[in-house]
């Protein structure tokens, strides 16, 4: 897969997928935990459906990552030039706000 052509971009893609799967310490994890605890006061079926949707999201994200990054390179994709620093800087700028909110959730609270 694409891991053979750009291993560092694969690492960035894995970090983005991990954030989507609500792995600790991401802001998605705190959101899903808050949602699930608030659903305990409702019907039991809502907790089950929320857990099922979280499982489906995680399964789809893992499938998407492994199908694009692992295995052999498809014949229609030609290896490209190595990634530039600006692409890695752009990925860092996308993940820094999420990391900042995960480490300090009070950043979103009004003063």
UniProtKB/Swiss-Prot annotation:
This is NADH-ubiquinone oxidoreductase chain 4. It is found in: Mitochondrion membrane. It comes from Caiman crocodilus. It is a multi-pass membrane protein. Belongs to the complex I subunit 4 family. Its EC number is 7.1.1.2. It holds the Pfam family Proton_antipo_M. It catalyses: a ubiquinone + NADH + 5 H(+)(in) = a ubiquinol + NAD(+) + 4 H(+)(out). One of its GO terms (cellular component) is mitochondrial membrane.
